[in-house]
């Protein structure tokens, strides 16, 4: 089959502070299904996933364990790769932000933005959420806590480099107006428009109170802040600024698939960075909802408390890979939150796989055995309706 063109899809790069949970698996299974479908349609697909390995939280966890940050992430990342292999995730590249190729790419991105006049040194004083690696103002907090994860924030004051995000506010609003499909679903887009319209502050992009990160090329007392580091992975993997033909072939990305808690970084910070660097913007960001347990987002902290129901490895052992994938793709409406429990999963498998599809398969096999000598006969006709259905299936999406 001749290629219909290129298709570049990415998951977020996951933070290896602990083993991944069912929410990460949900996102990755969706991306894998989209990549596989596009390949079946005849597209030349590039599917990227990976890990975001720098930051204060990793350094703190490594110190508590008595190992280096690199040793800490190496152990967790090995488990993530094993999980995706077990799940038969068909990624084309797995990028780690501690790789030399990425360090060079991030420093090149910093310098391009700096030379554009969009980075300056100042002092940050405000509120910081360590788990989210996010800075906030008092007005952005919800009940005095991080608006993304609901955890407490701490006061921070340090010298830092800043990106002139405020310079790109009007361009971002113009992007949402002229290309509403850039961010889906609509609820996420409306949230980001409101966020920009309330007034954007410049973005802190370096830290000087810890050293587990990529050094700022013009000032090695600073490490580059995690979001400038992490977001650049999408072009690092294509060999940006190295002459690699992959970048010319696959960029811009067709879709960044992310959880709703990081839509802001992908739909505001990332396009502003690319505007500063004079690079094309991705075609689309899609923000999926959360999987909820007891009315709360499934999280690593819940997994740490022994709630093994959200551990994908245990779910695979209990139900099988295909059943888990089917459930994740079938049960939830994209963009909306959904309830996850063992009972919900069992009900879906029994209704769909055992009753509907299982009974259909059983009856079909019985008829083939009874009337066709246990051999599937070749099709003898191909009606117009068959052709229409085949065309719809091939061209869907």
Residue ranges with predicted function:
Residues 2-49, 101-105, 131, 149, ...:
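Structured secondary-structure scaffolds
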Residues 52, 372-397:
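Acidic, turn-prone loop/beta-hairpin segments
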Residues 123-124, 141, 160:
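Flanking scaffold residues of small Cys/His-coordinated metal-binding clusters
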Residues 72-128:
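A broadly conserved sequence feature marking short terminus-proximal activation segments
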């Amino acid at each position: 089959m001749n290629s219909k063109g290129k298709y570049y899809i990415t998951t977020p790069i996951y933070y290896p502070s602990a083993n991944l949970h069912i929410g990460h698996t949900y996102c990755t299974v969706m991306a894998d299904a989209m990549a596989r479908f596009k390949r079946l349609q005849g597209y030349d697909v590039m599917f990227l996933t990976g890990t975001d390995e720098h930051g204060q939280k990793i350094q703190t966890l490594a110190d508590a364990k008595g190992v280096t940050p690199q040793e800490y992430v190496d152990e967790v990342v090995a488990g993530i790769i094993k999980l995706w292999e077990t799940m038969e995730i068909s990624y084309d590249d797995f990028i780690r932000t501690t790789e030399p190729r990425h360090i060079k790419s991030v420093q090149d991105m910093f310098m391009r933005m700096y030379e554009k006049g969009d980075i300056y040194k100042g002092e940050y004083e405000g509120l910081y959420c360590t788990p989210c690696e996010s800075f906030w103002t008092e007005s952005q907090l919800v009940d005095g806590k991080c608006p993304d994860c609901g955890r407490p924030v701490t006061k921070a004051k340090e010298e830092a480099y800043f990106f002139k995000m405020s310079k790109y506010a009007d361009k971002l609003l113009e992007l949402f107006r002229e290309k509403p499909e850039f961010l889906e679903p609509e609820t996420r887009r409306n949230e980001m428009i409101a966020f920009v319209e309330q007034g954007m502050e410049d973005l802190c992009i370096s830290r000087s109170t810890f050293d587990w990160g990529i050094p700022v090329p013009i000032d090695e007392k600073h490490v580059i802040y995690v979001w400038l580091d992490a977001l650049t992975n999408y072009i690092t993997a294509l060999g940006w600024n190295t002459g690699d033909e992959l970048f010319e072939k696959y960029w811009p990305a067709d879709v960044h698939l992310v959880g709703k808690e990081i839509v802001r970084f992908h739909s505001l910070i990332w396009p502003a960075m690319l505007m500063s660097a004079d690079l094309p913007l991705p075609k689309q960001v899609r923000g999926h909802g959360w999987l909820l347990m007891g009315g709360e987002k499934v999280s690593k902290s819940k997994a740490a408390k022994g709630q093994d129901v959200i551990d994908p490895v245990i779910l695979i052992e209990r139900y099988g890979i295909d059943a888990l994938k089917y459930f994740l793709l079938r049960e939830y409406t994209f963009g909306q939150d959904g309830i996850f429990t063992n009972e919900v999963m069992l009900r879906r498998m029994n209704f769909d796989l055992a009753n509907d599809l299982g009974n259909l398969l059983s009856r079909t096999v019985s008829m083939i055995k009874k009337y066709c000598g246990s051999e599937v006969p070749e099709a003898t006709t191909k009606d117009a309706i068959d052709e229409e259905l085949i065309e719809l299936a091939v061209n869907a999406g």
